[in-house]
Amino acid sequence: MEKIKLGILQVNHDKSEDIGDKFPDDAHRFRDLFDSLESRFKYRVYMTIGDELPNDINEQDVYLISGSPLSVRDNHSFSNKLYEFIQSCDSQKKPLIGTCFGHQAIAVALGGKVEKSKIEWNVGLEKTNFNNFKPWMLPEKD
C-alpha cells in the first residue's frame, strides 16, 4: 500500500524549560500518535512558525496545522501566508485539518471569527454550542 503523504505545518516551537525541554514537539507527537495506530503516512514537517510553507499545494496528499500557545487574534509574521495557504487548500479541495491554533487559523482564513475565551484557555475537551448550522454539518447536534 502506498503511504499517504502528510504535511505537518508546525506553528509551535516551544523551547521553554517547563515544556520544550521535557516533551516532544507537536510534529513528533502527531507522528508518534499516527504511527502507533497504523504506519500509513510519510511525513514532511514545515516549520511554518519560521515562514516555511509548501511551495506547491500538491507536495503532500493532506495537511495538518499544529497547535500553538500563540493566538490567531495576533498578527504573526507567518499569519497572512498561512491564511492564503488555507484558502488554497479550501478552493482546491485539498484535505486539511487543524488542531488548537490550527483549527482557529482555518476558521479565520475562511471568514470565521475567533474570540478570547471568557474562562481562559485550556487543554482538553470543551463543549461547543452552535448558533446556526450549515448543510455540511450533519447530523445537527450540539
Label every PLM stretch briefly.
Residues 1-77, 81, 90-92:
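N-terminal beta1-alpha1 cap of cysteine-dependent amidohydrolase-like domains
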Residues 53-59, 105-107, 138:
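Short loop/helix-cap segments at secondary-structure boundaries that form the rim of catalytic
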Residues 74-76, 108, 118:
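Conserved catalytic-core motifs of eukaryotic protein kinase domains, centered on the activation segment
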Residues 89-110:
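Catalytic nucleophile loop
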Residues 110-142:
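Pocket-forming structural segment of enzyme catalytic cores
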